[in-house]
A protein has these predicted regions:
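Conserved micro-motifs of the catalytic ATP-binding
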Residues: 2-6, 39, 43-46
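Acidic ATP/Mg2+-coordinating residue in the GHKL
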Residues: 89
Length: 163
């Protein structure tokens, strides 16, 4: 019998984003990454500990696959019954042929094999956690840069507060 290791509660997205940035501040500073957080006060239901873990993995990937003058941008949007947290970097991107497989266990992709040593476990774990927590996860890359989005469902109460 396994106990669930998460607690979903109402969290202001900027708070979990700032916590994740603080967790990774040494890595970000050492690699001269410019960080921008667009904050419009959006709220979502989540387990902040695990969402921080997911964001730290995304930050780690952005640093690993950075270009000169690396930057990270966190932004939120509301579409229909969802709040979307997007993390965009200006790194080397992900080849189109690799995109469908980025969540597969052990998949390192072309860049993971040629540019950096990669285990292929990070995004796989993120996807598993998102599935457990009821959060959507998508990755988009158009050659240069990558955008990773966490998609939080919102209920009627939250929609009323934020709408």
């Amino acid at each position: 019998h396994t106990e669930k290791d998460y607690t979903v509660r109402e969290i202001r997205i900027r708070d979990v984003v700032h916590d994740a940035i603080a967790d990774s501040k040494y890595l970000l500073r050492k690699n001269h990454v410019t960080v921008e957080v667009e904050d419009d006060g959006k709220i979502a239901y989540m387990d902040d500990k695990w969402v921080r873990f997911i964001l730290n993995q995304i930050i780690s990937n952005a640093v690993k696959y950075r270009t000169e003058q690396p930057s990270l941008r966190f932004s939120t949007a509301q579409k229909h019954n969802q709040v979307i947290l997007s993390v965009e970097d200006n790194g080397i991107g992900i080849p189109q042929s690799d995109l469908p497989r980025v969540f597969e266990k052990g998949f390192t992709g072309q860049n993971g094999r040629t540019v950096h040593s990669s285990t292929g476990i990070g995004l796989y774990l993120c996807k598993r956690l998102c599935d457990k927590l009821g959060i959507g996860l998508s990755v988009c890359s158009q050659g240069n840069g990558t955008s990773v989005s966490l998609i939080f469902p919102i209920n009627d109460f939250v929609a009323g507060v934020q709408g």
